[in-house]
Amino acid sequence: MIVEGAARRVHIIQGEYKVLSDPNAVLSTILGSCVAACLRDPVAGVGGMNHFLLPGSATSPASGGDATRYGVHLMELLINGLLKQGARRDRLEAKIFGGAKTISTFSNVGEQNAAFAMQFLRDEGIPVVGSSTGGEHGRKLEYWPVSGRARQYPLTGAETQRTVALEQRPAAPQKPAETSIEFF
């Protein structure tokens, strides 16, 4: 039996991913225009989450080579992390969250992020069993990686603006990103 109050919380920030098999663990993040992909293998009892800022990859000169901000890199790392923990690709299922239009501009990076995640998963043959994307406000997300349960809380306008400010800052320095990705 999973007791919600006894949950071990693991917070994910922009540019990170985590893979867990602890049934009492809950992954959490706060999203504005960023997207979180939540994947799991229900048979292996393992799941994970990533949090990316931009769709595509870090191939443009403007990217500064920071692959951890980009969807392609974090999606591959999450899938590979799940496979290393015993998941099988043919059993993976996904839920997608975020992608709000938090700034009034001509470009809608949130919509692009959500579309990228959906297309990536479609191309990989991973079914999306749930999603909540778009809108004008951010959201706080909680995801139980073993059960696949997800819960989100809408953010107020002020909370959304704080989230936007955080998303526009460079990602926190981390250990060097894995530069090789194994494609299956």
UniProtKB/Swiss-Prot annotation:
| Keyword set, alphabetical order | Chemotaxis, Hydrolase
* Any one GO biological process: chemotaxis
Q: Which InterPro entries match?
A: CheD-like_sf, Chemorcpt_Glu_NH3ase_CheD, Cytotoxic_necrot_fac-like_cat
Give the signal peptide, or none: none
- Origin, by domain of life? Bacteria
Its Gene Ontology molecular function terms? protein-glutamine glutaminase activity
**Transmembrane segments in this chain: where?**
none
SUPFAM superfamilies in the record = CNF1/YfiH-like putative cysteine hydrolases
Provide the catalytic activity annotation.
Answer: L-glutaminyl-[protein] + H2O = L-glutamyl-[protein] + NH4(+)
User: Using the chain's own numbering, where are the disulfide bonds?
Assistant: none
Question: Gene3D superfamilies, per this entry?
Answer: 3.30.1330.200
The EC designation for this entry is: 3.5.1.44
Q: Which family does it belong to?
A: Belongs to the CheD family.
Q: Which PANTHER family match?
A: CHEMORECEPTOR GLUTAMINE DEAMIDASE CHED-RELATED
* Functional note: Probably deamidates glutamine residues to glutamate on methyl-accepting chemotaxis receptors (MCPs), playing an important role in chemotaxis.
Q: What's the protein called, per UniProt?
A: Probable chemoreceptor glutamine deamidase CheD
- The organism encoding this protein is Rhizobium etli (strain ATCC 51251 / DSM 11541 / JCM 21823 / NBRC 15573 / CFN 42)
